Amino acid sequence: MFRQEQPLAEGSFAPMGSLQPDAGNSSWNGTEAPGGGTRATPYSLQVTLTLVCLAGLLMLFTVFGNVLVIIAVFTSRALKAPQNLFLVSLASADILVATLVIPFSLANEVMGYWYFGKVWCEIYLALDVLFCTSSIVHLCAISLDRYWSITQAIEYNLKRTPRRIKAIIVTVWVISAVISFPPLISIEKKGAGGGQQPAEPSCKINDQKWYVISSSIGSFFAPCLIMILVYVRIYQIAKRRTRVPPSRRGPDACSAPPGGADRRPNGLGPERGAGTAGAEAEPLPTQLNGAPGEPAPTRPRDGDALDLEESSSSEHAERPQGPGKPERGPRAKGKTKASQVKPGDSLPRRGPGAAGPGASGSGQGEERAGGAKASRWRGRQNREKRFTFVLAVVIGVFVVCWFPFFFTYTLIAVGCPVPYQLFNFFFWFGYCNSSLNPVIYTIFNHDFRRAFKKILCRGDRKRIV
């Protein structure tokens, strides 16, 4: 990613980063005093300490948050869905950024020169691009996974196995490596002509136009465009499904499977255990992103854990189903469906306000079913607003963290001057995305919050499980 300004050997590799001599630029890289005296640092002691503290907090928060994500996925029963392996791989990339990249970037920044030699300069910058690119491509893969689970519904969810998810993750890393490593493959011949003696070596970003443009497109602009288009499409589908009430929705509106059962808004099939006909076969209220709004099955569904809103959890399985929803299983033994009551019969053992003749009972049942549909309809409208906000957070944080860096990076390559301080700020601001990913993809999810409580509050573990 970086150009070798000062030739070190005949036939050397064109590196990702350049270990170049930089004489007389004390504001950027520091200088060496005549006679081998003390090096001048680019910042005062107070500023240096502030930068070290801020970068240290960034590294700690990134490692801590992403380690929590990995532990939660592997220890929580509610997070065993195969697609959560995306979050494990994403968290691993962010941890590697915080441990193998940021410390050396910090040292280079506060010391004013590259201390660690040419070989590690190339490795460090290759890893920098690899991990940051893989983090971005992971977000893109997650958005595509959500889109396929909506548009292909049953077919994709049947194919969404751990093996398939792992194959996609490997593909993500291969794409990131292809974007990151081409300069290490090309060999650039340079003469061994004389030049000025090295003063302060520095590891700088590659300014070769072909690589800057290609890496910027592959690392940011293309994944960003894909994410935006995919999330816009997800929002359009969710909005269309909630705009039409369930009672007016045709068989093609939600791609209902045979039998008339509606699919859940996230594209999954009907709720497990719902086997009765008519109003009783209506799926339970669900949120736009696939998480249930009221009762939830004991076993987490594939589409829930990765979603960004509230999701199912085992402690909600015993929650009452509310009016208009007959209980299923053993607890429904004493209940008689209105559709089974013959004309002239009365419902057994009902209270004073219960239905009398079969026609009245059937009418009340239909009225209760209609009220339940209206309630679900209003709930979906409210959840649409929350889902829109979550999508705005996902896309907004991604763009805000990375767009300034890649935009100025491209401007420099085409010859537009950019102040070093501004570019350096954008360079560090991009690292913040690695620490924010756990917040975006976990804090909005109820199962992750409960898993974090289980991890951090061991005394309360039995109740949380």
Curated annotation (Swiss-Prot):
Q: Where is the composition biased (Gly residues)?
A: 353-364
- What membrane topology was assigned to this protein in its record? Multi-pass membrane protein
Q: Does the keyword ATP-binding apply?
A: no
Lipid attachment (S-palmitoyl cysteine) is at: 457
Q: What is this protein called?
A: Alpha-2A adrenergic receptor
Instruction: Give the span(s) annotated as Disordered.
Output: 242-377
Q: Which GO terms describe its biological process?
A: adenylate cyclase-activating adrenergic receptor signaling pathway; adenylate cyclase-activating G protein-coupled receptor signaling pathway; adenylate cyclase-inhibiting adrenergic receptor signaling pathway; adenylate cyclase-inhibiting G protein-coupled receptor signaling pathway; adrenergic receptor signaling pathway; cellular response to hormone stimulus; DNA replication; fear response
Q: Which residues carry this modification: Omega-N-methylarginine?
A: 368
Comp. bias intervals (Basic and acidic residues): 313-330
PANTHER family cross-referenced by the UniProt entry: ADRENERGIC RECEPTOR-RELATED G-PROTEIN COUPLED RECEPTOR, ALPHA-2A ADRENERGIC RECEPTOR
Q: Which residues are glycosylated?
A: 25, 29
Q: Where does this protein reside within or beyond the cell? A: Cell membrane
Tell me the keywords, alphabetical order. Cell membrane, Disulfide bond, G-protein coupled receptor, Glycoprotein, Lipoprotein, Membrane, Methylation, Palmitate, Phosphoprotein, Receptor, Transducer, Transmembrane, Transmembrane helix
Gene from which the chain derives: Adra2a
From the Swiss-Prot or TrEMBL record, what is one GO molecular function term? alpha2-adrenergic receptor activity
Disulphide linkage map:
121-203
Query: Per the record, what ranges lie on the membrane's Extracellular side?
Result: 1-48, 112-121, 189-207, 415-424
According to the UniProt topology, which residue ranges lie Cytoplasmic? 75-85, 145-164, 233-389, 446-465
